[in-house]
Amino acid sequence: MKPSGFPNAERKSRPAVFLAALTLSATVGAATEAAGDSNTYGHHRWYVSATVGAGGDGSAATPFNTLAQVQQASGSGDIIIVVPSPVSVPPLDGGIALKSGQRLVGGGPAVVKFGAPLVTGGPPVVGASGLPSLPRITNTTAASNSGDAVTLADDTDVENLVITRPHRGAIYGQDAVGVTVRGNDLSGFNTSGTVGFVVQPFDLATFTPGVGIEVATGVRAGWAAILIDTANVSTSVSVSNNYVHDGVCGDGIDIRGMNIGDIGVLVTYNFITKLVQCQSVSAIQGISTQVTGASRLRATLFGNTQADNGSPGANMDRLFVNPAEAGTLIETIDHNVDITGIGGASTNGFEYILSNGNANSHVTISNSYFRNNPGDMLEEFNYGAGSRTTLVLDNVTVEQTTISGGVPSYATPPGSATITGNLGECLAISADGANDTTVLQMADSSFTGCDNNGIQVTSNHAADNGVGNIHTVIVNIDNSTINGSRFYNLWVNNLTPLTNLRVRVQDSDLSVSSSGVPVAFDQPTGTTVSAVIDLGRGTLGSDGRNCIFGGAIYDLEATQYNVTAENNWWGSARGPLPGKVVESVAGYNIDTSKSLRRAPPACNGEEPSR
């Protein structure tokens, strides 16, 4: 059984960005200040200050006093330094559009600093330095740059700035090649309530056979503090060490690929906290990635923390992944901490929704911790047609969902739930498009305190979502804990024709359901051409050694599926208790032979492998 708390990640190496993250915030401000007017690269160095009068020439001795002046005077490759001013002085207003190769840098000491992690063993958390004088800018109207404080260009850097209360975003880039955003303090963004990221249209999965609910206009989220759009170029993006907090109506960090854009992005050691949803949008998101058209996106997220995000009734998704159309999205999330989502039932720690089309995607989450959420903590939804989603969970801890939306009428016990998401699952997985392939690979992970189900997997082809059947559903669970859920710890159910189902579970604790059945496989209205469910000694190679007992009704139940479940622990040396393992339809079989005589390591026992 895996312990609670942040996962032990000693076996995982940290990338080189770790040391860079810890040292950058202490050096970037001081280094730019000490450089003075020297010009190593042959470019000009310009200064702008909120505390000087008019008539300056942009030098260190007589800075400009508006962003418009320094934007006009500076050229490609120049360095622009924002001079710190007392926090009682209004920030420089009007925003600035950078030229290629420019660096926009806040002078003076670092405006952010690293503090202790929120969870023991987690990544350090970046926050405000609390200095009396800061390099502050904003853009309070849409009169210039659409209300963004900074507009990026090719090969630009934005470092060590405090950006507060811009009309739209703090930093925006469109088809900007090779950009870096690091060590900034961003707050109060999107005072206008402008829509930014739009979750692409999708067919919402339900528990009614053949029925989906069309969400034709998608879901509108607020314009992000940092938004990078790429449609026609190939670019690399780095977003690191930023303190993104107290948003008015905006997402945190959004990366979007469109058309034929090609993006590689590194998002590291950012702290996102206290984002709220306003009335003009339907969602708010912490860190989001998206592909549409034929765009491609490769994202690496490392060492980020999200905490206390959302507002009453909000649709708050702290990590959001949205492939659509013919896009390709590959994402790795490592050493992430997410604590306390605030909002309604559609609030998630991580939502992975392939909205439509034949997009291809793969997301890996490793060495990460999620706690306290009023909706599904994790979601994998494959709503395309001919599309593929793969979710890999490696050393991931999920604790405490705080709502119970129940189960559908055909579940055990019967309930009244109608849609497959937003029920309070630790992980909800749904597929409803023709020819879809949906994969879960889970290892060395722990789900506890799931107030509805631990893992719910539903296959239900919506009749209006492509021609043909859902193609493949794969669930592979190894050395993990999913126990003590209100209803199911693991429930795989199919409502319409499915071509392939593969389920393999070994060395895992699936014990105890306070109100239902720990493990179940059901197709009350569906059929599966080829189904293999291997909980022990089956054809998929599971060694068993699972803990399956403690259900309020049954311990293991199946409807129209054969299940191999040898070499498992049923809470007793005598094997399953009478009436606790049930196949609901004659002609199918659950094989529980050769049961273990002692508890295996999965539930703190010492039964050796046979």
PLM feature segments, named:
Residues 30-69, 84-86, 599, 609-610:
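Right-handed parallel beta-helix/beta-solenoid
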Residues 31-41, 559-610:
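Extracellular/surface-exposed low-complexity segments
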Residues 68, 76-118, 166-167:
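N-terminal extracellular ligand-recognition/capping segment immediately after the signal peptide
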Residues 75, 93, 99-100, 132, ...:
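Parallel beta-helix/beta-solenoid
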Residues 95, 147-149, 169-171, 192, ...:
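Structural detector of coil-to-beta-strand junctions
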Residues 103-166, 185, 190-193, 200-209, ...:
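Right-handed parallel beta-helix/beta-spiral solenoid domain characteristic of secreted/periplasmic
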Residues 111, 144, 165, 188, ...:
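Residues in short coils/turns that link rungs of repeat/solenoid architectures in beta-rich domains
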Residues 161, 184, 242, 270, ...:
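Consensus "Asn ladder" position of solenoid repeat domains
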